[in-house]
Amino acid sequence: MTQNVNHQLLDRELAADDPWRLDGNPFERKRHTQMLQLALAQGSITNALEVGCAAGAFTEKLVPYCQGLTVIDVVAQAIARARQRIKEPSRINWIVCDVQQFSTDELFDVIVVAEVLYYLGDIAEMRAAIKNLVRVLAPGGHLIFGSARDANCRRWGHAAGAEPVIAMLNETLIEVERLECRGESVNEDCLLVRFRNPISAS
């Protein structure tokens, strides 16, 4: 599936009242609860990065626990919808950009990247995105990854899902905790993993 087709799919979904049913679906609420549990495993968050905000459903849950939060999304409409939703904009730095091109001198003690990487065109782009995220993960920081399983992602026309990306992340980070989230539908089946940067703070 090409990047243009993926962007068209994202635009179409974001036009809905409840994109991806993130607010109304019990599975999505459970997934967000588990993501937040993983993100807060080390306590309060100094500086977080959320990659891909959809319409801000998880951003709204995460921001109260962050001293600072940067949110990036390749789709301007996603950022616009999330900004309308969030009541504490002063804590959030909103950036429209691709995860592969994201550039900053900041380091983040928590990075959340869920249901995002399978929208990239191929494995090489996923590797580039992972390399970029690891670059901005603070020493000892945690990266929270979530994705539908590989079989579902491939059936949907994506290059890869959870299992191959988890293997790539394990090449440079240390897997600390893994959760499974399942709903009633065969499509509602994802893995959520917390990784730690093995480089210690000096």
Task: Please provide the spans of the model-predicted regions.
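A short SAM/SAH-binding and catalytic strip from SAM-dependent methyltransferases
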Residues: V110-A124
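Class I (Rossmann-like) S-adenosyl-L-methionine-dependent methyltransferase catalytic domain
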Residues: M1-G43, N47-S103, L120-N132, H142-S202
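A short acidic, Gly/Pro-enriched loop at the edge of an enzyme's catalytic core
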Residues: S103-I111
